[in-house]
């Protein structure tokens, strides 16, 4: 008999034979009957056994979280809360759990995050925890489908590189045979090379690595980056793609996971597009109205972003950032080269992602290298692609974990990461 997922039991008829597999979440042995709560990735169901000597002997010493195979019949006349249960006929123990559990799965005992991450394998069995990753998967799938619908193709670029994408020192070194190499911060350089190759619209979903010694609730040293690059486009085109991608991801998450999220007290609405736009200089004026002094060329502090974010419902763009705050590949504004054709997507005070129109002229690119005091020799493979017909192009990179954290209203990015890598954690 083929396995039936618990979430599909309602599609069957009363008295249909079923075979379910999963974890024993809870167990109650009464005088004449035993009640089991079985769980698989799709949900839970109550299983009822009439007590026989064999059943009682098997169940009375069976620990929670043991893995079972149960055969029985659908009972749609059940008085259980769900109105459906399985009348058990046989049970096979596939794997017996040890006692005690390192973490409770259903008991209302709240472990701290460090303890949970140290025992992540069992923490992920909790419905409120696993629902985060179901939601994250749906967000990513919605974004992927949208990008495919817009003519983007998915690509995969190297994660072991010889040069820093951003030109900085925040890199993890690795030994690559006889050469020094690094884990890539971003697929930026390779995305741009593909514009020269004529691919025109590409996106990538993959790991990115930042050797930054921060230890905050919003940063990871390894994260999943969703990156796009598009030819014959500017920063405005990139913003339109980004806001629609974010909306599509949230929309798909609500369609696929809305019920589970509501059961966990998370209510989400689809954001309205277009997202509001405000320039960097307009942000300075907002701060000055609050009596704050701010110098052009400085980055905004968390407190300053909180003040700016109070003017917006949720998502908004800050545009036209100073050239001094942007990487070498960012296109300066034609009318005012002290600012750039760039943007940050914000959610209130939290930065979601950055993007820009890129430099496509090789002479301007070399000028930007010199302004940033970068070693041109390290980027020869990249510069070469600009000499033989590089089209105007733009793009962005979006951290999946941070987006999920923001959308679900969570307080720590580690909640949206299966096995976080931060300043102190490389296990498990």
Swiss-Prot record:
Alphabetic keyword roster: Aminoacyl-tRNA synthetase, ATP-binding, Cytoplasm, Ligase, Magnesium, Metal-binding, Nucleotide-binding, Protein biosynthesis
UniProt GO MF annotations: aspartate-tRNA ligase activity; ATP binding; magnesium ion binding; RNA binding
Cofactor(s) in the UniProt record: Mg(2+)
Binding site for Mg(2+) 3: 351
Any one Gene Ontology BP term: aspartyl-tRNA aminoacylation
InterPro entries: Aa-tRNA-synt_II, aa-tRNA-synth_II, aa-tRNA-synth_II/BPL/LPL, Asp-tRNA_synthase_2, Asp/Asn-tRNA-synth_IIb, NA-bd_OB-fold, NA-bd_OB_tRNA
Reactions listed under catalytic activity: tRNA(Asp) + L-aspartate + ATP = L-aspartyl-tRNA(Asp) + AMP + diphosphate
Site (Important for tRNA discrimination): 81
Residues annotated for Mg(2+) 2 binding in this entry: 351, 354
Main location: cytoplasm
Claim: Protease is one of the keywords in the record: no
A Pfam family per the record: tRNA_anti-codon
Complex formation: Homodimer.
Function: Catalyzes the attachment of L-aspartate to tRNA(Asp) in a two-step reaction: L-aspartate is first activated by ATP to form Asp-AMP and then transferred to the acceptor end of tRNA(Asp).
Protein name per its UniProtKB record: Aspartate--tRNA(Asp) ligase
Gene responsible for this protein: aspS
């Amino acid at each position: 008999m083929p396995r039936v997922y618990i979430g599909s039991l309602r599609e069957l008829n009363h008295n249909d034979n079923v075979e379910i597999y999963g974890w024993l979440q809870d167990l109650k042995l009464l005088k004449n009957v035993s009640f089991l709560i079985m769980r698989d990735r799709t949900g839970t169901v109550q299983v009822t056994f009439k007590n026989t000597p064999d059943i009682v002997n098997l169940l009375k010493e069976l620990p929670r979280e043991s893995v079972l195979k149960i055969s029985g019949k659908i009972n749609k006349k059940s008085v259980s809360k769900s109105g459906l249960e399985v009348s058990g006929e046989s049970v096979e123990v596939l794997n017996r759990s040890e006692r005690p559990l390192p973490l409770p799965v259903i008991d209302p005992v709240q472990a701290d995050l460090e303890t949970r991450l140290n025992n992540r394998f069992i923490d992920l069995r909790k419905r409120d925890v696993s629902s985060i990753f179901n939601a994250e998967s749906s967000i990513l799938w919605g974004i992927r489908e949208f990008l495919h619908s817009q003519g983007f193709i998915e690509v995969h670029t190297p994660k072991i590189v010889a040069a820093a994408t951003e030109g900085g020192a925040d890199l993890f070194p690795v030994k690559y045979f006889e050469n020094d190499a690094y884990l890539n911060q971003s697929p930026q350089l390779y995305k741009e090379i593909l514009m020269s190759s004529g691919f025109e619209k590409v996106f990538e979903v993959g790991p990115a690595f930042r050797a930054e010694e921060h230890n905050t609730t919003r940063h990871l040293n390894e994260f999943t980056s969703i990156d796009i690059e598009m030819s014959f486009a500017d920063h405005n085109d990139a913003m339109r793609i980004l806001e629609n991608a974010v909306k599509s991801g949230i929309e798909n998450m609500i369609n696929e996971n809305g019920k589970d999220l509501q059961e966990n007290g998370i209510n989400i609405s689809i954001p309205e597009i277009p997202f509001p736009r405000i320039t960097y200089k307009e942000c300075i004026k907002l701060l000055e109205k609050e009596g704050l002094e701010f110098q052009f060329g400085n980055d905004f502090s968390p407190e300053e972003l909180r003040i700016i974010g109070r003017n917006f419902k949720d998502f908004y763009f800050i545009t036209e950032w100073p050239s001094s705050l942007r990487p070498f590949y960012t296109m300066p504004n034609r009318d005012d080269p002290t600012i750039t054709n760039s943007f940050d997507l914000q959610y209130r005070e939290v930065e979601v992602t950055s993007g820009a129109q890129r430099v496509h002229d090789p002479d301007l690119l070399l000028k930007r290298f010199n302004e940033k005091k970068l070693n041109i020799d390290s980027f020869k493979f990249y510069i070469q692609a600009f000499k033989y017909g590089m089209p105007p192009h733009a793009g962005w990179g979006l951290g999946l974990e941070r987006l999920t954290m923001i959308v679900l209203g969570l307080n720590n990015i580690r909640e949206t990461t299966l096995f976080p890598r931060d300043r102190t954690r490389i296990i498990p």
